[in-house]
Amino acid sequence: MNYFPWLTIIVVLPISAGSLILFLPYKGNKTIRWYTICICILELLITTYAFCYHFQLDDPLIQLEEDYKWVNFFDFHWRLGIDGLSIGPILLTGFITTLATLAARPVTRDSRLLHLLMLAMYSGQIGSFSSRDLLLFFIMWELELIPVYLLLSMWGGGKKRLYSATKFILYTAGGSIFLLMGVLGMDLYGSNEPTLNFETLANQSYPVALEILFYFGFIIAFAVKSPIIPLHTWLPDTHGEAHYSTCMLLAGILLKMGAYGLIRINMELLPHAHSIFSPWLVIVGTMQIIYAASTSPGQRNLKKRIAYSSVSHMGFIIIGIGSITDAGLNGAILQIISHGFIGAALFFLAGTSYDRIRLIYLDEMGGIAIQMPKIFTMFSSFSMASLALPGMSGFVAELIVFFGIITSQKYFLMPKILITFVMAIGMILTPIYSLSMSRQMFYGYKLFNTTNSFFSDSGPRELFVSISIFLPVIGIGIYPDFVLSLSVDKVEAILSNYFYR
């Protein structure tokens, strides 16, 4: 047991400091903005320090554990802890949220509330990744809903922002009902004393029918958030209307919470049901890659096209989770981190382009590479990362998932060949929509009626955010062990404890 409450500080600091924004004397947006950025940087530094000096990489068990009794009636504890599965997403959350706060600089309306909501999201995301109590996980999961709804409805850029915000909250709240039913069902089943402790629940056995019922409840909630087809339709609308700082948080972190939940709860707590349904996950993931890669080129809206590319990339994560192999699951975790960076960067650059040319439809753009060479260079680089160019993080992640499904002992040879073939088609379709997006934006003749003096290329802020994201994308592509070393022992423990015993 760890005696210094590192994780409690990391979870509580953002929302506590965010609440103080309301009491700060108003001296302009600049003060609030710098206060929020300083809180995010402080949080990231504390997290990095705690993980560097108090986390043992070669230990697959839960570390930095904290356990405080909260509600005695149904064994509800403030129970936190991290392992190799959660450390990567937590660091990703800190990194992307800090840059998203910097990206929100152009927003001047209701600046206090905006930054409070971003910090509240920060706490909810870190809390979800570090919870070791099922009900605490649910509460942290729900902490996301209202901030995202308000960020969409108040600072969204399009005419349909209220529609998109309502659609988001209906989908996610609907999924959360199934999540709550699963949480309460697991809490009340079996033992004389109800328990929500992950450790206890991992060793709990259920009748097959009941385990499948719980599995369905959880997978619906996580399928909405991931998203998994056909529960993905909120995502393009949400991304199409949201401010790009919100899009960075959605693409970089929020979608990854669904994938994390699939591994943490469906795989770890319900292994027999997962073993039964993993072939269906692989099939759905394969269909998702093809479906989203085929749908993306038909989108006129730039941000919707990037959103469909996110849906396609999430398909690789689902296949990795369904493969039930060391390589597949490690590849899925690497893809979670990799796409967190790439998705956030693409939305950021799409937003900075919109700030300058005030156009979001691709068929109205064209020929802006000459006026904005820095944005063109960065956008092209991240497009290459998105289509899994060798040397970048996406290539390594997708290659490891490929290897995982090919070497899986669970599937016969012909299904594996078919799945691999369809995945390869999806990877061929990815450059089609990625490169056509760049061509329509940056090449050709100038199609819009604006004077050249209107344009300004990327400033120091945009360059800093873009390069800060690009460096880890290249770093992971060249040396993926930097991320894989965090999760490899935990992945081995999950698979050996639950599938090969």
UniProtKB/Swiss-Prot annotation:
The record's GO CC annotations read: chloroplast thylakoid membrane
Q: How does it sit in the membrane?
A: Multi-pass membrane protein
Write down the InterPro entries for this protein, in alphabetical order. NADH_Q_OxRdtase_chain4, NADH_Q_OxRdtase_chainM/4, NADH_UbQ_OxRdtase, ND/Mrp_TM
Transmembrane annotation, as ranges: 4-24, 35-55, 84-104, 111-129, 134-154, 168-188, 209-229, 243-263, 273-293, 306-326, 331-351, 387-407, 417-437, 463-483
**First-tier enzyme category under EC:** translocase
EC annotation from Swiss-Prot or TrEMBL: 7.1.1.-
Its localization reads: Plastid, Chloroplast thylakoid membrane
Q: Does the keyword ATP-binding apply?
A: no
| GO terms for biological process, alphabetical | ATP synthesis coupled electron transport; electron transport coupled proton transport
| Record keywords | Chloroplast, Membrane, NAD, NADP, Plastid, Plastoquinone, Quinone, Thylakoid, Translocase, Transmembrane, Transmembrane helix
GO molecular function annotation: NADH dehydrogenase (ubiquinone) activity; ubiquinone binding
UniProt catalytic activity = a plastoquinone + NADH + (n+1) H(+)(in) = a plastoquinol + NAD(+) + n H(+)(out); a plastoquinone + NADPH + (n+1) H(+)(in) = a plastoquinol + NADP(+) + n H(+)(out)
Q: Which NCBIfam families match?
A: NDH_I_M
- Homology family: Belongs to the complex I subunit 4 family.
Q: What is this protein called?
A: NAD(P)H-quinone oxidoreductase chain 4, chloroplastic
Q: Record the organism.
A: Buxus microphylla
